[in-house]
């Protein structure tokens, strides 16, 4: 199934609330309108002030999102962009997100 951004927002809202995540931004193929049945769903999320702290809670959050959507999910925290591997890597990620993004929660 290929979801609209509105459907994605509706499905992830309970999960985001459960984990106290304040904002989730859709990017990648779904944000560009190029998703296929095999596409994963890419999110940038704000973890500051949330219950998503540490590797185990990030994995629980990702699994809860995957269960809500029935699709694989990739996550990048907004805060992690500040410590990206190097400036070139950070620029690549940020430019890709900036050019095709949609706030779906928060």
Please report, for each region that a protein language model flagged, where it lies by residue.
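Short, aliphatic-rich beta-strand segments
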Residues: 40-46
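Catalytic core of pol beta-like nucleotidyltransferases
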Residues: 1-23, 32-33, 37, 48-106
């Amino acid at each position: 199934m290929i979801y609209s951004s509105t459907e994605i927002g509706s499905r992830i809202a309970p999960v985001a609330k459960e984990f106290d995540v304040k904002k989730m931004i859709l990017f990648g193929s779904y944000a560009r309108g190029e998703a296929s049945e095999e596409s994963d769903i890419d999110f940038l999320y704000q973890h500051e002030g949330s219950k998503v702290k540490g590797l185990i809670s990030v994995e629980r959050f990702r699994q809860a999102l995957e269960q809500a959507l029935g699709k694989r999910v990739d996550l990048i925290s907004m805060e992690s962009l500040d410590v990206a591997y190097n400036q070139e890597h950070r620029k690549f990620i940020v430019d890709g997100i900036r050019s095709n993004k949609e706030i779906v929660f928060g």
